[in-house]
Regions:
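Surface-exposed beta-loop interaction hotspot
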Residues: 78-142
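Mature extracytoplasmic domains of secretory-pathway proteins
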Residues: 135-184
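Short beta-strand elements that form the blades of beta-propeller/WD-repeat-like
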Residues: 108-110, 143-144, 197-204
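Short N-terminal segments immediately surrounding and downstream of signal-peptide cleavage
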Residues: 18-37
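Short alpha-helix capping/helix-loop boundary micro-motifs
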Residues: 40-45
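Acidic, glycine-rich flexible loop segments
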Residues: 171-214
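SH3/SH3-like beta-barrel superfamily modules
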Residues: 19-24, 46-82
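Sec-dependent N-terminal signal peptides
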Residues: 3-13
Length: 229
């Protein structure tokens, strides 16, 4: 029965992963904030607000979201009040060994990966009833199967992410990337919003049904957040 559940989990996970990707975007409104509506209607009750430069994730493609409204934690915001991160200035990257370096006049980002050495990590399993969930260093993981033995351990992971903005180092906590595995440099990119002094580091890691997107946000020299999908 346990094996049947795992097979079902694999099939459904792959099915969902093959669906449409959304977009990362930030709030950009002349009032400095956007209203969150309870429903997908401008006359719907206001249940909250999001300030400018708040990072969100949603489906902008008309085929999958014809309403022009993006779902957030408490409700919906209108697409016209959002700007996709891919519309900001892109900074080109260059792969050098185990690192990819993005460098221009305002920003320098170095992302380095390394091989996964299981002897340097605490690997445990959490009983989920129908299967055992793989836990690495006490955290749930992205990019690899969440169950299994040594054959499902990752090949690599992030070693470090270093950021310099206008000559000043920006500390990126290890907790912002130490649960992410199966790194792909060729799908990494960064975007810079000069007006807000905001940097967005994007990556599309993993493969097939285990693929995931991540976006880190840094504003005015301070690490703010990440969103994983």
């Amino acid at each position: 029965m346990k094996h049947l559940f795992i097979l079902f989990f694999l099939l459904t996970t792959n099915a969902f992963a093959q669906g449409p990707y959304g977009d990362y975007a930030v709030v950009k409104d002349k009032d400095g904030y956007v209203n969150i509506r309870a429903k997908e209607n401008v006359k719907s009750k206001i249940v909250g607000t999001l300030p400018n430069n708040t990072l969100v994730y949603g489906f902008f493609d008309k085929e999958y979201n014809p309403t022009n409204w993006i779902e957030v934690d408490k409700g919906y915001v209108h697409q016209s009040r959002l700007k996709k991160i891919f519309d900001f200035r892109a900074i080109k990257g260059k792969v050098q060994g185990n690192s990819i370096i993005f460098d221009d006049k305002d920003v320098k980002v170095t992302i380095t990966k390394q091989k996964f050495d299981k002897t340097k990590h605490k690997i445990t399993k959490k009983d989920q009833g129908s299967y055992d969930q793989l836990i690495i260093d006490g955290k749930e993981i992205y990019g690899i199967e969440i169950y299994g033995g040594d054959d499902s351990l990752p090949e690599d992971h992030y070693k470090s992410i270093t950021v310099t903005m206008k000559g000043k180092n920006v500390p990126i906590p290890k907790s912002a990337y130490d649960d992410l595995y199966q790194i792909s440099y060729f799908s990494s990119s960064i975007y810079y919003d000069e007006e807000a002094e905001a940097l967005y580091i994007y990556a599309d890691n993993g493969e097939a049904g285990l693929a995931y997107e991540v976006c880190w946000q840094i504003v005015k020299g301070e690490y703010k957040t990440r969103i994983i999908r």
